[in-house]
Swiss-Prot record:
UniProt subunit comment: Homotetramer; dimer of dimers.
UniProt similarity note: Belongs to the DapA family.
Keyword annotations: Amino-acid biosynthesis, Cytoplasm, Diaminopimelate biosynthesis, Lyase, Lysine biosynthesis, Schiff base
Protein name (database record): 4-hydroxy-tetrahydrodipicolinate synthase
Primary enzyme class: lyase
Repressor recorded as keyword: no
MF GO annotations: 4-hydroxy-tetrahydrodipicolinate synthase activity
UniProt xrefs under Pfam families: DHDPS
Residues under site feature: Part of a proton relay during catalysis: 54, 117
Length: 300
């Protein structure tokens, strides 16, 4: 059994928002909006933010833009929340360069996605994640999301990677609770729910928290859910989980980027529109989203 000698909840947080990247009307990164949003999320209960992930539209942002966003958010909230930099790509050499650059800017940790599009074998995944983890002293979270990468990180590969001292956890977005529970027991890796619809089930099998999209709109409720579960008040945790369910339905319809940006605008926080090929919500979609947000008590 491998035991990860790193206090992940204390060092990386338990409620992390996979933060959108705000854009100006001309499509450039809106640093002022990023500062406002980061402060709002931390004030609402998030103890960590993940930048330049799926919801951050990382395939459409340059490395310079990723580093610009990282600097701005670190300056805004880095003294009171953990700031995790998304630093993965389908190119190992590029990922290594980005990891080093993010570490140089002061990131508190790294989220590294499974290489997508090229469908590498498990031996390639092991070599990729090892090369990235070797390139830094920062804690690394693996991001297992085969719905987007096609290839999963198989359980045996995760177990092998757990022996690396810098690989401390997994953002799990493939709904394999059984394997995740066994891996946590076998390795000591920390697991985060990467699927808001499964946040409570993941806690039940041992996950330490969430890397959430709906926390853009409901961070306070998710913090209450975590607190209730941690204190043994499962009834309250279940009630909160059901209450915020409409936001998960909205995300399924619209996608995380479109839902988050439209929902924030409804709450009075303008972070701009997505970059192509993502699309802003239509008027009809915004009306439907507003119904879901009211049902979840996150919009008056």
């Amino acid at each position: 059994m491998t035991t990860v000698g790193f206090d992940v909840p204390a060092r990386l947080g338990t409620l992390l928002t996979a933060m959108v990247t705000p854009f100006d009307a001309d499509g450039s990164v809106d640093t002022a909006a990023a500062t406002r949003l980061a402060n709002r999320l931390v004030d609402a209960g998030c103890d960590g933010l993940v930048l330049s992930g799926t919801t951050g539209e990382s395939p459409t942002t340059t490395d310079d833009e990723k580093l610009q966003l990282l600097r701005v958010v670190l300056e805004a909230v880095g003294d009171r929340a953990r700031v995790i930099a998304g630093a993965g790509s389908y190119d190992t050499a590029h990922s290594v360069r980005l990891v080093k650059a993010c570490a140089g800017e002061g990131a508190h940790g790294l989220l590294v996605v499974t290489p997508y599009y090229s469908k590498p074998p498990q031996t390639g995944l092991f070599a990729h994640f090892t090369a990235v983890a070797d390139a830094t002293e920062l804690p690394v979270l693996l991001y297992d999301i085969p719905g987007r990468s096609v290839v999963p990180i198989e359980p045996d590969t995760i177990r092998a990677l757990a022996s690396h001292p810098n690989i401390v956890g997994v953002k799990e977005a493939k709904a394999d609770l059984y394997s995740g529970a066994r891996i946590m027991a076998d390795t000591g890796l920390a697991y985060y729910s990467g699927d808001d619809a499964l946040n409570l089930p993941w806690l039940a099998v041992g996950a330490i928290g969430f890397i959430s999209v709906i926390s853009h709109l409901a961070a306070g409720q998710l913090r209450e859910l975590l607190s209730a579960f941690g204190s043994g008040d499962i009834t309250t945790a279940r009630k909160i989980n059901v209450a915020i369910g409409p936001l998960c339905s909205a995300m399924d319809r619209l996608g995380g980027v479109t839902m988050s940006k439209a929902g924030l605008r409804l709450q009075g926080i303008d972070v701009g529109d997505p970059r192509l090929p993502q699309m802003p919500a239509t008027a009809e979609q915004i009306d439907e989203l507003a119904v879901d947000m009211r049902a979840a008590s996150v919009l008056r």
